[in-house]
Amino acid sequence: MTNSISGYQPTVTTSTSSTTSASGASGSLGASSVSTTANATVTQTANATNSAATSSIQTTGETVVNYTNSASAPNVTVSTSSSSTQATATSNKTSQAVAGKITSPDTSESSETSSTSSSDHIPSDYDDVGSNSGDISNNYDDVGSNNGDISSNYDDAAADYEPIRTTENIYESIGGSRTSGPENTSGGAAAALNSLRGSSYSNYDDAAADYEPIRTTENIYESIGGSRTSGPENTSGGAAAALNSLRGSSYSNYDDAAADYEPIRTTENIYESIGGSRTSGPENTSDGAAAAALNSLRGSSYTTGPRNEGVFGPGPEGLPDMSLPSYDPTNKTSLLTFLSNPHVKSKMLENSGHFVFIDTDRSSFILVPNGNWDQVCSIKVQNGKTKEDLDIKDLENMCAKFCTGFSKFSGDWDSLVEPMVSAKAGVASGGNLPNTVIINNKFKTCVAYGPWNSQEASSGYTPSAWRRGHRVDFGGIFEKANDFNKINWGTQAGPSSEDDGISFSNETPGAGPAAAPSPTPSSIPIINVNVNVGGTNVNIGDTNVNTTNTTPTTQSTDASTDTSDIDDINTNNQTDDINTTDKDSDGAGGVNGDISETESSSGDDSGSVSSSESDKNASVGNDGPAMKDILSAVRKHLDVVYPGENGGSTEGPLPANQTLGDVISDVENKGSAQDTKLSGNTGAGDDDPTTTAAVGNGAEEITLSDTDSGIGDDVSDTASSSGDESGGVSSPSSESNKNTAVGNDGPSGLDILAAVRKHLDKVYPGDNGGSTEGPLQANQTLGDIVQDMETTGTSQETVVSPWKGSTSSTESAGGSGSVQTLLPSPPPTPSTTTLRTGTGATTTSLMMGGPIKADIITTGGGGRIPGGGTLEKLLPRIRAHLDISFDAQGDLVSTEEPQLGSIVNKFRQETGSRGILAFVESAPGKPGSAQVLTGTGGDKGNLFQAAAAVTQALGNVAGKVNLAIQGQKLSSLVNDDGKGSVGRDLFQAAAQTTQVLSALIDTVG
């Protein structure tokens, strides 16, 4: 039977019962009295308030313990009556208060018992109990026989502390005592209740918060058989003593004590055996183990607050704040700020060289490609069809696949897909990224998409991969994805701020390194040269040298070339701005080979150059003067002879002691040039401003005659009319001496400058200095131009081409000279009997040249044509591929060589040209037809016409088709059925390719 204890009853109900019985004897019991009354009415009243509740112990099989908030004891009244010598105690239970009933089998009369006690002392003399003790003892034995089954179930008292429910018989059965009164019931139950006196609990029900049930699984009451005179007082022993042991204990908030305590389990017999001891009282049970254990709690004190309060809150003893900041996935600055947080960095991972932060809350990840923080981006990951977020496992798996294949995807997108998509969209190519990429694990495909429409972005709809997407290559991510690794931030750089950089400032005057630059040339120069006539800005690394000299206006010789078009000669800021290659030229005085600039040997603006002595043909890198040195000397000279702002005089150079050719020649031969001084015939006298050029560093100044202002005798070239397309300049005479004055049968400095200007316009095409990728490969170098001008007075036309031209005789105004032609010599009449793949094929050697062709054949298209940034430069490679892949009859004979697409793609990567984007695999519609074009002796001009047609056709294919026809074999372009003889020579191949591509354009476009 379950005993319940509660401290929450506002009231305890009153139970009233009446009995009728025969009259009997009367007697006394200690200080209490027992009386027997016929037809007496016994009223049991238990008053309980919020501060007091009823506590009772019943000997008929149940024990009820109630702890109250007050030390006062309730009043219990018990009246007994009986007419039979044999009585049976029965238990009748109600929900609130139940009275014990004794029924006589002889008279079928019943009596109810109740007890009251107001004293802590329970008398131990039970001998005076009534004469019917024998019968009483029998009944008591019957009652006592159940004592072994009585369990206090003390755990219920501690477990959850449910409300106190007095559902047991509070009153003991005292059979046969007719005269006993309520005083006789001052035994065990009352003693147990009285034992609570003095105990104080502020809120004992709180103790149930964390306590497991206290289970007393032993017999609380021992069998006391044979004690005829024992009454209910005999039950006032162990339980009362155990309860009394709690006296004096004080708990301000008992639930605190339960916070960390394990359940108290009293599995021992609380009460000792008191067999046969009629006079034993509750004192005999005061030495039990359970009582001792309970007594040990006396004096304990617990505070009201939980012991672990504030552990997870802020404070010196709390845990650190591990929360992550928020970020805006659309703002790169916000992403960098977020990733710089130490808690975020500790959660970042590395995969395939990329830094990753996986945000499981958003089903996204932040990617830092290849550790480049400038390219940080946030990528949302969802189900491609349902558009739902992924769980953590799938998110990590797909993130690993994306990182593993990102490098492969980037290369495929940048080189192949993006140019095609940009061309279709009509936007500039470069820098465009797909909006969405779907990685399909089922079909093992990866498709990139542009912006989705509302239907495609809706749930339950997968965008078409073939109509709307573009397949991209992610590599072998479906076989094996790379694992995530932790990042060692001790060796990896984190996101840097915009103001990143350490500044070192010298705070001590006079200390530290000297301000003058080191005389040692820099190994990696960066030169930006802006040449204006009379005022040139030379930017060498971080050193700017500006010189603009102004002289009084003087009368000078009228030049034949207008200077209005000789402004703003600008070479870009590259180390190879004037880096040209001329392996075939061995003429004297030229600056040949690869010209690599180095910084000036001194930081002053004297214009001096430092170089060891070498012969006139010494090239840079072999103890020869650097092009920077030559330009510096030229600049100093021009500042003198063309004084004033923005190029100075428009009437030609002022007479000086030397010419521009002398300056260049001296620098090339001796490593330095003498000072340029205006000649005395200007009328300005010795006070005219002059410019001095020192020989070497700190070398002595060289002063020459002011009357020497002629052009050096090594200035030569053919003469031409002023301003014509040949780049030549008029000269009065083809014969000149070094000391010939300007305007006196020699080319003027303006003529030389005009020729230089025209050359630079070709090798640096475009506005304001043109190409930023360095000079284009041409048929001659800048040194050749100056040498020819100094030698013959004219120079040949500069042609951007990978080959050199031939020499021929050209007449000038004052005679004739040997110069190079404008274009390469026309090829001999093509022969239909000469195999175009043979060594004697003139067209092949002409188009490719020996070294370039050999390089392309050896490397499979890896040979680079320097400066070949236009589509025309792709034709030699295509030609070389045709020579290798097709025989004389036009049949495909070699499949081992690289595809045409790979050659074109490599060309694009090298030159930055969009060119043809990929090889052709299949084309819609008819492939077109071709007709054989036979070449005759009069078809020389068709070579360039065919090349121009092929160029235009290829450009149209690149712009319109743009990979819509991917992967078609080259044989299908030049041969419809694989039979026939096509492409016998250059004319046939060019014409047929042009016609086929035109047919494709008509079919597709």
Swiss-Prot record:
InterPro entries: Chlamydial_TARP (IPR053108), DUF1547 (IPR011443). It holds the Pfam family DUF1547. One of its GO terms (molecular function) is SH2 domain binding. It is found in: Secreted. NCBIfam families: act_recrut_TARP. Belongs to the chlamydial CPn_0572/CT_456/TC_0741 family. Appears to initiate or participate in signaling events that regulate the actin recruitment, which ultimately leads to internalization. This is Translocated actin-recruiting phosphoprotein. It comes from Chlamydia trachomatis serovar D (strain ATCC VR-885 / DSM 19411 / UW-3/Cx). The lineage of its organism: Bacteria, Pseudomonadati, Chlamydiota, Chlamydiia, Chlamydiales.
